[in-house]
C-alpha cells in the first residue's frame, strides 16, 4: 500500500478484524463464541455497517470537491441502501459480497471522476479482497 497514509493503512487493516472474527466464528473456530450463527450475524451486521460507511466516504469525496449535481451524491447512497435492503435477506452474505464488489467499482468510478485521494484505490483494493475472503468463508460455513 505504498503512498497510503500509515494511519489509513493501519486503521483500514484493523477494520478487517471483525470480518476475520466473524468468519472464524462461523466455523466454530473463535474462542468464546460457541454458536456459529453468531459468526454469521457478526458478518452480516458489521458488513452492512461498513458497506454503508464506505458509501458515506464517497459522499464526502463529492462534497469536498464542491460537487452540487445529483450524479455523485445519488451514486454514493447506493451502498448504504443496498446494505439496508439485504441485511435480513435469506442470503445476506452473498448479497454483501455483491455489494462490496459493486462498491469497489464505485471507488474506481469516483477516481475516474477525479474524486477522492490519489491513494484511495491502493487502500481499498487489498481491504476489499480481505472483506470478500472473510464474507466468502462465512458464506460457506
Enumerate the language-model features and the residues they cover.
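N-terminal membrane topogenic signal
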Residues: 1-14
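Small-residue-rich segments of transmembrane alpha-helices in multi-pass membrane proteins
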Residues: 17-20, 74-84, 123-140
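Alpha-helical transmembrane segments of multi-pass membrane proteins
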Residues: 19-29
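Short juxtamembrane and helix-loop transition motifs at transmembrane-helix boundaries
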Residues: 32-39, 53-66, 89, 108-116
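Non-cytosolic membrane-interface motifs at loop->transmembrane helix junctions
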Residues: 37-42, 71-72, 117-123
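Helix-adjacent hinge/juxtasegments
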Residues: 58-85
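Transmembrane helix-loop-helix
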Residues: 86-102
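Interfacial loop-to-transmembrane junctions
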Residues: 105, 109-131
